[in-house]
């Protein structure tokens, strides 16, 4: 079992420098890990045997042929809820259900596609993270390199400090604003991803969110008889299958079989978790969006967010460091202070505050071709008094 988990360990690996928040990691790491784990688990035949096993009477159709046919063409149950109750007793099935008219059938066409559906969902939840990695391009990692440890490193010296202070004191409104807008876009994309996946599951399983609600409710209340009854209407463990073929004389023949669907024993639990997880993720994502709307609209709230991890630094120092700067500059400082050693973070903000007080506002003239290189040219800006 551990062999399946080992390739996925890197998804949950904790990094020293994180350019994303907890909600983001719930989307792009935890959710992706869980979906891929479920997909790999369902594809492991050594744990569950054949995905379908059909029982037929004696005749010209072999058991293996029937299994392959029903796997490809799909099985069905009756729309009548009593079918699910009777399906736990083979005697009752033979005695009561007989032929099910086409109009009363509910087909399990999803059965062989669940593994791919889960893998597709994992890919969808990975998209915002791939976009952000491409746009962020390791900027925060390079700025925080070696300065995240609990003990202040020896190389936190004048040259290194000057490089960071010079970068933070200069004014790059378009650069930092773009950095923030891309982050907000990916945050919005995470929220849209949840909505899209909820819609996708609802379409594939024909009203999943309403049909599976009684099953999840029964599970949470530990009413296991009701749980078995309701979940079997969506994920039946026993279903019927009809095999049509031409007999020796040319007449149409029909073989109906009773098929066991062992993967649905796992599917019912996976999708009960998905039902709860996606709804919880949707609520958390909505609250996170509201948080960022408040951040973008409230200067006082931004000041408080930046000051909190820098305690006991005075608010006036932080306000001066942000004086004349846009929300993009605040976001960069916020990202740095969340990752840097607290002592280094306080020293940086205090030094930037003093530099602003002494030198006034600094505007950098962006060279063609991208960002400035302060590590090779720490004086690469023009000063303009305001």
Curated annotation (Swiss-Prot):
<dbReference type="GO" id="GO:0005243">
    <property type="term" value="F:gap junction channel activity"/>
</dbReference>
<keyword id="KW-0407">Ion channel</keyword>
<feature type="topological domain" description="Cytoplasmic">
    <location>
        <begin position="1"/>
        <end position="21"/>
    </location>
</feature>
<feature type="region of interest" description="Disordered">
    <location>
        <begin position="358"/>
        <end position="386"/>
    </location>
</feature>
<feature type="compositionally biased region" description="Acidic residues">
    <location>
        <begin position="374"/>
        <end position="386"/>
    </location>
</feature>
<comment type="function">
    <text>(Microbial infection) Modulates the development of Plasmodium falciparum oocysts.</text>
</comment>
<keyword id="KW-0303">Gap junction</keyword>
<dbReference type="Pfam" id="PF00876">
    <property type="entry name" value="Innexin"/>
</dbReference>
<keyword id="KW-1003">Cell membrane</keyword>
<feature type="topological domain" description="Cytoplasmic">
    <location>
        <begin position="133"/>
        <end position="187"/>
    </location>
</feature>
<keyword id="KW-1133">Transmembrane helix</keyword>
<keyword id="KW-0406">Ion transport</keyword>
<dbReference type="GO" id="GO:0034220">
    <property type="term" value="P:monoatomic ion transmembrane transport"/>
</dbReference>
<dbReference type="InterPro" id="IPR000990">
    <property type="entry name" value="Innexin"/>
</dbReference>
<keyword id="KW-0965">Cell junction</keyword>
<feature type="transmembrane region" description="Helical">
    <location>
        <begin position="22"/>
        <end position="42"/>
    </location>
</feature>
<feature type="topological domain" description="Extracellular">
    <location>
        <begin position="43"/>
        <end position="111"/>
    </location>
</feature>
<feature type="transmembrane region" description="Helical">
    <location>
        <begin position="273"/>
        <end position="293"/>
    </location>
</feature>
<feature type="topological domain" description="Extracellular">
    <location>
        <begin position="209"/>
        <end position="272"/>
    </location>
</feature>
<dbReference type="GO" id="GO:0007602">
    <property type="term" value="P:phototransduction"/>
</dbReference>
<keyword id="KW-0812">Transmembrane</keyword>
<comment type="function">
    <text>Structural component of gap junctions. Required for normal development of ovary. Required for normal egg production after blood meal. Required for normal development of testis.</text>
</comment>
<dbReference type="GO" id="GO:0005921">
    <property type="term" value="C:gap junction"/>
</dbReference>
<protein>
    <recommendedName>
        <fullName>Innexin inx4</fullName>
    </recommendedName>
</protein>
<feature type="transmembrane region" description="Helical">
    <location>
        <begin position="188"/>
        <end position="208"/>
    </location>
</feature>
<feature type="topological domain" description="Cytoplasmic">
    <location>
        <begin position="294"/>
        <end position="386"/>
    </location>
</feature>
<comment type="similarity">
    <text>Belongs to the pannexin family.</text>
</comment>
<dbReference type="GO" id="GO:0005886">
    <property type="term" value="C:plasma membrane"/>
</dbReference>
<feature type="transmembrane region" description="Helical">
    <location>
        <begin position="112"/>
        <end position="132"/>
    </location>
</feature>
<keyword id="KW-0813">Transport</keyword>
<keyword id="KW-0472">Membrane</keyword>
